[in-house]
Amino acid sequence: MDGVLVILLSLVLLVLVALILAVAWLARTARGDRHYGAATRATRSSSGMAASVDALALDDDDGPAVRVLPPVRPAAEGERPAGDAPGAAYGESAAAPDAGLGSPAPRAPHHDAAAAPEPGAAIGGAPTPAAGSPADASDTGRIAETVDTGTVLAVAAVADTPSRVAATEDTSLEAPLRESALRESAPGESASVRRAAEREAAQIVARAEREAAERLARVEREAAEIRRRGEDEVASLRNQARAEAAADASRAEAAVRDAARVELEAARAEIATARTSFEEELRVRRAELRGREEALAAREQRVEERTAGLDEHASRLAGREQDLLDREDELAHRTAEAADDEAARQAALERIAELTAVQARAELVSTIEHEARREAALLVREIEARAEEEGEERARRIVTTAIQRVASDQTTESVVTVLHLPGDEMKGRIIGREGRNIRTFESVTGVNVLIDDTPEAVLLSCFDPVRREIGRITLAALVSDGRIHPHRIEEEYARAQVEVEERCVRAGEDALLETGISEMHPELVTLLGRLRYRTSYGQNVLAHLIESAHLAGIMAAELRMALPLAKRAALLHDLGKALTHEVEGSHALIGADVARRYGESEEVVHAIEAHHNEVAPRSLCAVLTQAADQISGGRPGARRDSLESYVKRLERIEQIAGDRPGVDRVFAMQAGREVRVMVVPEEVDDVAAHLLARDVARQIEDELTYPGQIRVTVVRETRAVGTAR
């Protein structure tokens, strides 16, 4: 690869030299008339310069042009440079040193002589080493060095040309003659230079080809040597591998032989074991076969004996069958005779009784049916009486147990809330300038503020407990902060609304947690919590619902009913009271619609809508809900009424019952929940007592308004008195 690069570099340099020579020749031929003098050999000798370059300085409008000849390589010791005389440079004649200035140097012969150099000579007369000599490897480097040196000398000559031309012009007296001589010799010299360059290029190319061929031959020899060595090594490795493979094969064969011997011994042992086990199994099988053969023989003996017995039994059965056939014929004959006798007797009875058999059968059925109905009626009456007694007793026990197990605190609430103040001066701040603050508070909250002489207290009055609670929280926040003005009132009112809403949600969640009910719609939970601020006859509705849920759960457990369903229905039965001021209608029906809208079951919805008999109850859950509602709301102290209305209601109840004829005395008992009417037994019989109780109850329902139920009891007592003397 290095040889190829050197060859390519040499070719490039040769092309550059040829181009330089061609440009110089073209410039010389194109200049025309103006040429300036050249330095002669005598001038160079007198100036002391070493003549290694023959330069011709030409000058015209385009500038100077220089023809560069290769420099003369210094001769080695004992070697003469090529030329006509010793010490002559390449392309120079052997003129004497004292030649005149005007005599031009004949150059053509020297170029002709240089056109055919000896095979071993270098360019410019220097000897060239023969191919294969020790200097062969550095020939290309010397060629490049020679070309580079010539180029440098040419450039130096060009740089030195103006000074030499000036000196020549000053010293030369025959410039016109030299100019004409140079003009005549220029074409010949150009052709000589071209031929010399072509010969040199041909020699360099030939030498490069020889070097390439020699290097290629050398590379081929080295490759052959390497191939031979590789084949030897491969053969050696192959032999070694064969030897190792043979050794491994022998070892493997020995190992296989040992393994085969071990396996053979193991197989022999296994075969011996298998043979032993097979012989043992064969003995066992033979013993089993002998046992089976004996069993089969015994079984065949039994079968034969049984077959003989069956044959004997079959013969006996055949005899009995014949006997039965005979008896059957006899019975058929007797049956026919009996039927004839029965027909004769029936005809005689019909004639005597004057009734047919069908009529007698119908009369008998009618008699039996009448007796059965009488007995059934007596039995049903007895069962009903017992059921009423047991049912009433059990219901009383269940209700009593439920009431005893539920002990809930109840505090009545009014429509007025008292807010304590830190001082009486706060009342003036609440009123504000010209009553601005109190008017703003009442218009924003809808709660009336009552300020009287009560020390350190104001009253908040509103029939809506929710609005009253929002107003209380708003006023308490204003009093604690101290800043009371309309804008502040609106801010605190908005904050109080959010707080009350959160309290409602929390109250609903607490109610669910207390009653053990889960998975309820969030809207139902919110509505349930809003009942915390609702009252019914002074009783808190949410507390009433929680108490009703506990009562319904206890009664459902006593009756072995679904406990969660009863609790859920009782907890939601007054849900409509949270919306009664927003939606028209009964709170029972409103609550049922809301529960149905939010995914409650139909049993719960029916219990809600039927707890005040707007819809007839159709399930035990609805009845339990009614009972729990009545127990929670009807117990003494649960609900309150004003004393005046309470007294008037009791008086009117006694008056309604006392105005009836035959009534002796009337007692309103259990805070008006029960009325006992004592009648005169001579004037009012049992039927009239029932009518009196119904009429009194209907008149009370029509004229009075009361919570819960009122029971009317008419007592008719007959006394018989006897005196023993």
Curated annotation (Swiss-Prot):
GO cellular component: plasma membrane
Keyword Transmembrane helix: yes
Domain HD, chain residue ranges per copy: 541-634
One Pfam family matching this protein: KH_1
Positions of the KH domain: 415-481
Cell compartment(s), UniProt: Cell membrane
Enzyme Commission number: 3.1.-.-
Region (Disordered): 62-140, 165-195, 300-321
Ranges annotated as biased composition (Low complexity): 84-100, 114-137
Enzyme class, UniProt record, top EC level: hydrolase
Transmembrane segments: 4-24
Keyword Cell membrane belongs to the record: yes
Keyword annotations of the record: Cell membrane, Endonuclease, Hydrolase, Membrane, Nuclease, RNA-binding, Transmembrane, Transmembrane helix
UniProt GO MF annotations: RNA binding; RNA endonuclease activity
A GO BP annotation: mRNA catabolic process
Membrane topology field: Single-pass membrane protein
Role played: Endoribonuclease that initiates mRNA decay.
UniProt cross-references to NCBIfam families, sorted A to Z: HDIG (TIGR00277), RNase_Y (TIGR03319)
Family from the record: Belongs to the RNase Y family.
Entry protein name: Ribonuclease Y
Species in which this protein is naturally found: Frankia alni (strain DSM 45986 / CECT 9034 / ACN14a)
